Amino acid sequence: MREITESQLRYISGAGGAPATSANAAGAAAIVGALAGIPGGPLGVVVGAVSAGLTTAIGSTVGSGSASSSAGGGS
Protein backbone atom coordinates (compact mmCIF):
# COMPACT_ATOMS: atom_id res chain seq x y z
CA MET A 1 0.00 0.00 0.00
CA ARG A 2 1.28 3.46 -0.84
CA GLU A 3 0.14 7.03 -0.36
CA ILE A 4 -2.10 8.72 -2.90
CA THR A 5 -0.14 11.35 -4.81
CA GLU A 6 -1.44 14.86 -5.42
CA SER A 7 -1.94 14.13 -9.14
CA GLN A 8 -3.97 10.99 -8.34
CA LEU A 9 -6.14 12.95 -5.89
CA ARG A 10 -6.77 15.67 -8.50
CA TYR A 11 -7.74 12.98 -11.01
CA ILE A 12 -10.17 11.37 -8.54
CA SER A 13 -11.70 14.68 -7.48
CA GLY A 14 -12.60 15.88 -10.96
CA ALA A 15 -9.53 17.74 -12.20
CA GLY A 16 -9.27 15.24 -15.04
CA GLY A 17 -12.36 16.58 -16.81
CA ALA A 18 -15.30 16.08 -14.45
CA PRO A 19 -16.77 19.28 -13.02
CA ALA A 20 -15.66 20.26 -9.51
CA THR A 21 -19.01 19.83 -7.77
CA SER A 22 -19.98 19.04 -4.20
CA ALA A 23 -20.89 15.51 -5.26
CA ASN A 24 -17.45 14.92 -6.78
CA ALA A 25 -15.77 16.32 -3.66
CA ALA A 26 -17.84 14.04 -1.41
CA GLY A 27 -17.07 11.05 -3.62
CA ALA A 28 -13.35 11.76 -3.60
CA ALA A 29 -13.42 12.18 0.18
CA ALA A 30 -15.27 8.88 0.53
CA ILE A 31 -12.61 7.13 -1.56
CA VAL A 32 -9.79 8.65 0.50
CA GLY A 33 -11.63 7.82 3.73
CA ALA A 34 -12.11 4.23 2.62
CA LEU A 35 -8.42 3.91 1.82
CA ALA A 36 -7.49 5.46 5.16
CA GLY A 37 -9.73 2.97 6.96
CA ILE A 38 -8.09 -0.12 5.46
CA PRO A 39 -5.92 -0.80 8.55
CA GLY A 40 -9.15 -1.05 10.59
CA GLY A 41 -10.47 -3.87 8.42
CA PRO A 42 -13.85 -3.91 6.64
CA LEU A 43 -15.54 -1.87 9.37
CA GLY A 44 -12.77 0.73 9.19
CA VAL A 45 -13.26 1.05 5.44
CA VAL A 46 -17.00 1.61 5.81
CA VAL A 47 -16.65 4.05 8.70
CA GLY A 48 -13.86 5.95 6.96
CA ALA A 49 -15.78 6.27 3.70
CA VAL A 50 -19.05 7.31 5.32
CA SER A 51 -17.53 9.79 7.75
CA ALA A 52 -15.28 11.45 5.15
CA GLY A 53 -18.05 11.63 2.56
CA LEU A 54 -20.62 13.03 5.00
CA THR A 55 -18.20 15.54 6.47
CA THR A 56 -17.37 16.86 3.02
CA ALA A 57 -20.99 16.92 1.88
CA ILE A 58 -22.16 18.74 5.01
CA GLY A 59 -19.26 21.17 4.84
CA SER A 60 -20.07 22.07 1.24
CA THR A 61 -23.68 22.94 2.08
CA VAL A 62 -22.98 25.27 5.01
CA GLY A 63 -23.53 28.87 3.94
CA SER A 64 -21.99 32.02 5.30
CA GLY A 65 -25.18 33.17 7.06
CA SER A 66 -27.54 31.47 9.43
CA ALA A 67 -30.88 30.11 8.29
CA SER A 68 -32.83 32.47 10.53
CA SER A 69 -31.10 35.62 9.28
CA SER A 70 -31.47 34.62 5.64
CA ALA A 71 -35.19 33.99 6.20
CA GLY A 72 -35.66 37.43 7.73
CA GLY A 73 -35.86 36.21 11.33
CA GLY A 74 -32.42 37.43 12.40
CA SER A 75 -31.70 40.71 14.11
From Swiss-Prot:
Disulfide bonds: none annotated. The lineage of its organism: Bacteria, Pseudomonadati, Pseudomonadota, Gammaproteobacteria, Enterobacterales. It is a single-pass membrane protein. The chain crosses the membrane at residues 30-50. The keyword Secreted applies. Its main location: secreted. Bactericidal antibiotic. Active on bacteria phylogenetically related to the producing strain. Keywords: Antibiotic, Antimicrobial, Bacteriocin, Host cell membrane, Host membrane, Membrane, Secreted, Transmembrane, Transmembrane helix. It comes from the Bacteria. The gene is mchB. GO terms for biological process: defense response to bacterium; killing of cells of another organism. One of its GO terms (cellular component) is membrane. This is Microcin H47. It is found in: Secreted; Host cell membrane. Residues 1-15 form a propeptide.
